[in-house]
Amino acid sequence: MSYPASEKLAIIRIVGQSHLPAKRTLDQLGIARRTFYRWYDRYLDGGPEALAD
């Protein structure tokens, strides 16, 4: 499944603001940890613009 950059950014923010562990939040969202951390690394390296495919 492909996610638009805006949705990836929203997911990164949800995980960051959650009081739950990242794994649990991602499980509830149905997002694989590997996928999330790939997005997160891209976000850290290049900001929101780096999330565009």
Where are these regions (language model features)?
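Residue-centric detector for conserved, function-critical "anchor" positions
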Residues: 1-53
